[in-house]
Amino acid sequence: TVAAFVAASLGLGLCADCTNLRAENGKIIATRPVNSGRDYADIISRTSPLLATVLCYSDTDGVIVSAGRGCDKQTATKLADKINAALCCSRAAVDEGKFPYACQVGLTGKAVAPDVYIALGISGAVQHVCGMENSGTVIAVNPDKSERIFDCADYGVTEKAENLL
């Protein structure tokens, strides 16, 4: 990438895919996913300045309906249309061909920060959660109550999304 080329050319460190940057004791601390997205780590650069790529919030719609592997496109679209919400999805839904990449939320997609985020059939992989973690209220709908999406949800419904409409 361009950022990696610039960092290498200048002999500087690069922290990619950051979800947060903050200053402490005169140092910049970058937070990013690690361990295949299962955890987060704070990175303190040994070089100055620090180069970083950061997930920017590209969607701040009032309400977003987001579909994962466990929800069909028709159900998600119907709900989004009914409540006048933006429609997004997880990487799994893109990989299955249900949605275009432009709809993908997460580390390899876009970051969103709506007032309300409705996750339909989304497991809650850290790669997805880091793209929606700054949402106001999170409502998770998934028949498997052990899915990680419930860990970051304000409200949870253990049911198939199709059964709610």
Describe every region a protein language model picked out.
Residues T1-L165:
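N-terminal glycine-rich FAD/FM-binding segment characteristic of electron-transfer flavoproteins
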